[in-house]
Amino acid sequence: MASAKEIKTKIASVKNTQKITSAMEMVAASKMRRAQERMAASRPYAENMRKVIGHVAQGTLEYKHPYLEVRDAKRVGYIVVATDRGLCGGLNVNLFKKVVSDVKKWKEQGADVEFCPIGARSVQFFKSFGGEVSAHASGLGDAPKLADLIGTVRVMLKAYNEGKLDRLYIVFNKFVNTMTQTPVIEQLLPLPKSDEEVASYPWDYIYEPDPKEVLDLLLTRYVESQVYQGVVENIASEQAARMVAMKAATDNAGEMIDDLQLVYNKARQAAITQELSEIVSGAAAV
């Protein structure tokens, strides 16, 4: 058994760790609230943009934009949004598992794959994963702006425009609630058509002054908005996961301190008993 002094040192160490995890939990809770506000503010725009694009994809257009044409999938691109930092439970691991599983299906069909990781953990993973990394972004902070992502996104759009990509997906953790964050893969290009409800009431738009000019701008902005929303959702998911992970770590530290305190008390009691025994033995010898 370890000495009482060693156990006391260990208790002090665990208490220090507990203070750190408790502070990180409170910081994550504060950041999560702000991230939720940003997510709630941008989500209606992203959802309505998706609906508009769904109608466009269903319509009969005089100008057929390349983003509306379905090509044979010979090369698939993924924009994978993960975190810059760790200590957020299995958030990144679950996301990467989903990507790897989807990549495996495409490779079985003979398609090549390339990645655009966003977030330091994503960059690190896919550089070691072995796939081609066409562009990447990290260090966006807790409140990224659309301008921070445009350059990275347009690298992938350029590849699609040049026929170097036939599919483009975005992967991120969708914020459901504080306890639940779900990794999702959403198709960006070619544009996914609307669901059955919307498709049952189709209509066409009239584009003025020029369909090509309007659609070029609209569809590019659509992709950018979906990537931005994915990043914002992932940040909210990250802070929620970190808050939960740090709370669990704080609770576990408390349990460990209680267990160590019992061991310390036993060690101290054993030491006192031994000292008393030695005193009694010494007195008897005299």
Swiss-Prot record:
This is ATP synthase gamma chain. The lineage of its organism: Bacteria, Pseudomonadati, Pseudomonadota, Gammaproteobacteria, Alteromonadales. GO terms for biological process: proton motive force-driven plasma membrane ATP synthesis. One of its GO terms (molecular function) is ATP binding. Produces ATP from ADP in the presence of a proton gradient across the membrane. The gamma chain is believed to be important in regulating ATPase activity and the flow of protons through the CF(0) complex. GO terms for cellular component: plasma membrane; proton-transporting ATP synthase complex. PANTHER family: ATP SYNTHASE GAMMA CHAIN, ATP SYNTHASE SUBUNIT GAMMA, MITOCHONDRIAL. The keyword Ion transport applies. InterPro entries: ATP_synth_F1_ATPase_gsu (IPR035968), ATP_synth_F1_gsu (IPR000131), ATP_synth_F1_gsu_CS (IPR023632). Keywords: ATP synthesis, Cell inner membrane, Cell membrane, CF(1), Hydrogen ion transport, Ion transport, Membrane, Transport. Gene3D superfamilies: 3.40.1380.10, ATP synthase, gamma subunit, helix hairpin domain. It comes from Shewanella frigidimarina (strain NCIMB 400). The keyword Transport applies. It holds the Pfam family ATP-synt. PROSITE patterns: ATPASE_GAMMA. Disulfide bonds: none annotated. The gene is atpG. It is found in: Cell inner membrane. Belongs to the ATPase gamma chain family. It is a peripheral membrane protein. F-type ATPases have 2 components, CF(1) - the catalytic core - and CF(0) - the membrane proton channel. CF(1) has five subunits: alpha(3), beta(3), gamma(1), delta(1), epsilon(1). CF(0) has three main subunits: a, b and c.
